[in-house]
Design a protein with these regions (language model features):
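Transmembrane alpha-helices and adjacent helix-loop boundaries
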Residues: 1-179
Length: 183
């Protein structure tokens, strides 16, 4: 890697760190942009570098989001009551509960989709061409249909994630809505 590449990468990193302060009205859009960059990178690795036309990446992304949110809530509150309450009950995480739950959820969200990807990959990586593409597309569609029927994670309504706690009287902007789909 030459000197100009390093300067470019450092410039992008610095811009990414200061952009929320320079453009405060666009914090959510910038965070969504970062998520989409990660998804595009997974597509590039599989579709470009490896030569596989895969459409199932979103399965692992969604599985990780739902697992992280479910573990974060389920550690301290009954998950079924959280998703069924529809705003009737109020559940409030303390800051320590919020961050402990998020840490545990992130670990589970990293490990379980990795194992699932390994098992699914072992089963379907022998397919080639159109067969592989159709199989991975079917996996994504099937996962959406299955998750739409599981009531404990909100089924068709989605999963409301815990709000970011107020710490020291300061209210932080919450990006937890990016972790689980809400409709």
């Amino acid at each position: 890697m030459n000197k100009n590449s390093w300067i470019l990468y450092i410039g992008i990193l610095v811009f990414g760190l200061v952009a929320p302060f320079i453009f405060p009205a666009f914090k959510v859009q910038l965070s969504i942009l970062c998520v989409l960059i990660v998804l595009a990178t997974t597509w590039n690795i599989q579709g470009g570098e490896m030569g596989y036309n895969t459409f199932g990446n979103i399965l692992f992304y969604g599985l990780g989001m739902y697992l992280c949110a479910s573990v974060q809530v389920g550690m301290f509150f009954p998950l079924a009551e959280w998703t069924e309450s529809g705003g009737e009950k109020t559940f409030v995480h303390t800051p320590s509960q919020f961050f402990q739950g998020m840490a545990a959820g992130l670990v589970v969200a990293a490990v379980v989709p990795t194992i699932v990807a390994g098992l699914i990959g072992y089963a379907i990586l022998g397919l080639r061409g159109h067969y592989f593409a159709i199989c991975t597309l079917g996996l994504g569609v099937a996962a959406g249909e299955i998750s739409g029927g599981i009531e404990i994670i909100g089924a068709g309504q989605g999963f409301t994630t815990p709000p970011f706690p107020n710490i020291g009287g300061l209210e932080a902007v919450s990006y937890t809505h990016l972790r689980a789909h809400e409709t």
